Amino acid sequence: MMDLEPQESLTAPTAPAIGATAVMEKDKSLLIPQDAPVEQNLGYETPPEEFEGFLQIQKQPNEQNAGLEDHDYLNEGDVLFKHLQRQSTIVRDAISDRSSIPVSIAELSCIYERNLFSPRVPPKRQANGTCEPNPRLNFYPVFAVPEALATYHIFFKNHKIPLSCRANRSRADELLALRAGASIPGIVSLEEVPKIFEGLGRDEKRAANALQKENEQNHHGNSALIELEGDNARLAVLKRNIEVTHFAYPAVNLPPKVMSAVMNQLLIKRAQPIDKDANLQDPEATDDGKPVVSDEQLTKWLGTDNSNELQQRRKLMMAAVLVTVELECMHRFFSDITTLRKIEECLHYTFRHGYVRQACKISNVELSNLVSYMGILHENRLGQNVLHSTLRDEARRDYVRDCIYLFLLHTWQTGMGVWQQCLEEKNLRELNKLLDRALKSLWTGFDERTVAAELADIIFPERLMITLQNGLPDFMSQSMLHNYRSFILERSGMLPSMCCALPSDFVPIYFRECPPPLWSHCYLLRLANYLAYHSDLMTDSSGEGLMECHCRCNLCTPHRSLVCNTELLSESQVIGTFEMQGPQSDSNFTTNLRLTPGLWTSAYLRKFEPQDYHAHSINFYEDQSKPPKAPLTACVITQGKILAQLHAIKQAREEFLLKKGHGVYLDPQTGEELNLPSPLCATASPHSQHVPESRKTGYCAATLKETAATAGNLGGRILGESGRGRGRGLGRMGGGGGGQPRRGSRGGGGRFQGRSDRRQTVAFNQALSNETRCEQISESQP
């Protein structure tokens, strides 16, 4: 490292510059005539002898450092100032289109962030689909949350934590457990749930020391979290470390522009601010702050003048506008079959689960590194996607459920932010016309759910919903969700590193135990719990061998599962082993087909059968008694005869290399030597190195001949078995039958056939008995 003197800095002038400036000022003073009048007292002037001494002092360090500068690789140009030049270029580009230069740091920071994260020209797209790396981001603080992006995510609803929250329900994990046949959660209305219970409940028992702690807290205030006898370890530690009464719930409201228009057109006229310069007017002469529909008009529409009925109708309308329509829009968006499929696919990337894990293994590409925001795809290799694998049982279920809850929150907030930004004045004027036209129909609706559905048709039309569904959800890593979780906890006054709280701990699990302002969060929590079980993320269904990437969900099983789809398994075994050439055309252009890992992975990720996808219920393939509705086929080569022929060609080529080939043959996939003897041939006896080469070759040929005979007597293993109990070298895929197709198999591929017979041959060499090996070695002695 370079040693910088304390008085020097990157922006301060150096000592030679100071001396040069002083010399220039002294030379300029010599040009002034002696009789010129002095206009200003310059104060003390340095005598010539003292000034020469000053220059001598400044010259000594330069002479001492002259030797160092000759050997310094940074001495040419202002290398250390290059980062300042780059950053100044970015700032200059940010303010180039502005008529005035910003004078405050806040304004400049806002312009700087918008230029970086929300540029006018979208980033260039690379060949792999991700946007190119932006070197301009190097100068933005790494762990800072940019305000230009967080347009909707920074808003919260500070609300009192109900005593009926999930953290105060010791049997919450048991109550949230779902089994086969469970349906997607729905929504409710205030008419259906007129009474709310926010208490602790009769089934919950306080811990032994909870009463003593409560007496101590009476002087400081009661916490909403109460220690219970059935609390798990995480909640017990959480309740002892923090005392909270309120929580910052992320805002999930409809766009403020829309809600302001709805309130102004359906409920109460918005009051305009008072102009001080205007003359005072009679408040009765204006409609500001008055109901949109008067009692006389409502009596005429309903055909009754009963004050109680009129009051109930106003309550119904208020509940529909403030609570139920938000739930209705949210339920329409998330309950769509296409949206549910896309959400579950993104969750498979987030947790590196099921078919995504299988694709990563075969393609040798970490697909879970892909993240996106508002349709722009990025590759981030710093994210983590296997953190959930370190947890077990209830801790894993709580973490997975909370991650999906945050994922749904982020998705909804992103959509609401886009909706809010796209609305213009002309759109709001058209919305006001539609609301005014449907005023009578809304006020005379059948019930609260009917009014909310009709209002949702107006403010959340199908065209808007489809547009948002096409761009959402985004790919997110567990690291992004963890940062989002920490951001929420910090806004709630909780230090994430000192407490083990999850945002879903403060949400009730039932609508009847949740205050209506938090019903949207209750719905998202219940939906997250459903998606966790529907995607088979709550438990680890994987195993060994073919079961390594197994997942029971409808996206993976049976069509994307190597265990259930034998055609897909056969196709995966011939990846990179053949090349098909088509006939030459008139332009001497030949079309070739090679089944590369990339081509197969792309087709594998796109493989989806909507007929066997049950979005609104948990209906796993293993729980069904009927076969799948769509046939089980491969991804690229969908004809079984072609796959069987490719397997036969592959086996014939491998047998030829093993029996008649000369030289050293390497497997193109693993690099293994195909026609050399097993390492046991060379290491079984210390005297084998003195055996003549011809006798060694004869022994190896005899070994291969015996192994080929043994291979015909070994069958495949049980489905999902690791293979440890059926011969040492059977491997993960099981064994085949000496290159010949078994009865009932597809083109010699067998349902549980191994990757190749030559791997079995190499493995069988290691499984020879000690007696036979010793006899062969003793015969080879000179």
From Swiss-Prot:
Family label: Belongs to the adenoviridae shutoff protein family.
Q: Can you name one GO molecular function term for this protein?
A: RNA binding
What triggers production of this protein? Expressed in the late phase of the viral replicative cycle.
Q: Which UniProt keywords apply?
A: Chaperone, Eukaryotic host gene expression shutoff by virus, Eukaryotic host translation shutoff by virus, Host cytoplasm, Host gene expression shutoff by virus, Host-virus interaction, Inhibition of eukaryotic host translation factors by virus, Late protein, Methylation, Phosphoprotein, RNA-binding, Translational shunt, Transport
UniProt superkingdom: Viruses
Misc. remarks from the entry: All late proteins expressed from the major late promoter are produced by alternative splicing and alternative polyadenylation of the same gene giving rise to non-overlapping ORFs. A leader sequence is present in the N-terminus of all these mRNAs and is recognized by the viral shutoff protein to provide expression although conventional translation via ribosome scanning from the cap has been shut off in the host cell.
- Extent of Gly residues compositional bias: 728-752
Q: How is it modified after translation?
A: Might be cleaved by the viral protease. Phosphorylated. Tyrosine phosphorylation enhances preferential binding to tripartite leader mRNAs and allows ribosome shunting.
Sequence segments annotated as region (Disordered): 715-760
Give the protein's biological function. Protein that inhibits host translation while promoting late viral translation by ribosome shunting. Blocks host cap-dependent translation by binding to eIF4G, displacing MKNK1 from cap initiation complexes and preventing EIF4E phosphorylation. Binds to the tripartite leader sequence of viral late mRNAs and recruits host eIF4G, PABPC1/poly-A binding protein and 40S ribosomes subunits on viral mRNAs, allowing ribosome shunting and efficient translation of late viral mRNAs even though conventional translation via ribosome scanning from the cap has been shut off in the host cell.
Q: How does this polypeptide assemble, per the annotation? A: Monomer. Interacts with hexon protein; this interaction allows chaperoning and trimerization of hexon proteins. Interacts (via N-terminus) with host initiation factor EIF4G (via C-terminus). Interacts (via RRM domain) with viral mRNAs that contain the tripartite leader; this interaction allows ribosome shunting and expression of viral late mRNAs.
Tell me the InterPro entries matching this sequence. L4
Location of Phosphotyrosine modifications: 349, 665
Specify the RRM domain's residue ranges.
Answer: 332-450
Predominant subcellular localization, coarse grouping? host cell
Name the GO cellular-component terms.
host cell; host cell cytoplasm
Region (Binding to host EIF4G) residue spans: 262-329
User: What protein name applies here?
Assistant: Shutoff protein
Location of this chain's protein in the cell:
Host cytoplasm
